[in-house]
Amino acid sequence: MSITKDQIIEAVASMSVMEVVELITAMEEKFGVSAAAVAAGPAAAAEAVEEQTEFNVMLTAIGANKVAVIKAVRAATSLGLKEAKDLVEAAPTAVKEAVSKDEAEALKKELEAAGASVEIK
């Protein structure tokens, strides 16, 4: 007859702390392993290098062709003519916020083609 996992858990739960320590030591010796926790140093470094997933497209300067920039902003944002004009004239300002990297790069190319200066943050 074999012992089930539940029976093992119940047996360990009924042991004192000293008995559990002795059990762990015996298991380490029997199986040639260590119950020590693995250091989490490299994982913390990986979190610090977390890649940004949302970007803001900032219009920093209008450039010489204001009308083309307004048209590009209207096409990208679905704003009306007055709202797009106000947005462009308020530069430096955010054209779109929390967009993907691909969308931000595409919008930057469109606005720069229209003559605007653009940053992605």
Swiss-Prot record:
SUPFAM superfamilies membership: ClpS-like, Ribosomal protein L7/12, oligomerisation (N-terminal) domain
GO CC, sorted alphabetically, is: cytosolic large ribosomal subunit
Cysteine pairings via disulfide bonds: none
Q: Which Pfam families match?
A: Ribosomal_L12, Ribosomal_L12_N
Q: Which InterPro entries match?
A: Ribosomal_bL12, Ribosomal_bL12_C, Ribosomal_bL12_C/ClpS-like, Ribosomal_bL12_oligo, Ribosomal_bL12_oligo_N_sf
Q: Which UniProt keywords apply?
A: Ribonucleoprotein, Ribosomal protein
The record, for CDD domains, names: Ribosomal_L7_L12
Which GO BP terms apply? translation
**Domain of life here?**
Bacteria
Q: Which GO terms describe its molecular function?
A: mRNA binding; structural constituent of ribosome
Please verify whether the record's keywords include Ribosomal protein: yes
Its family remark reads: Belongs to the bacterial ribosomal protein bL12 family.
NCBIfam families associated with the record = L12 (TIGR00855)
Q: How does it assemble?
A: Homodimer. Part of the ribosomal stalk of the 50S ribosomal subunit. Forms a multimeric L10(L12)X complex, where L10 forms an elongated spine to which 2 to 4 L12 dimers bind in a sequential fashion. Binds GTP-bound translation factors.
Function statement: Forms part of the ribosomal stalk which helps the ribosome interact with GTP-bound translation factors. Is thus essential for accurate translation.
Under the heading HAMAP family, the entry gives: Ribosomal_bL12
Q: What is this protein called?
A: Large ribosomal subunit protein bL12
From which organism does this entry originate?
A: Tolumonas auensis (strain DSM 9187 / NBRC 110442 / TA 4)
Q: Which gene encodes it?
A: rplL
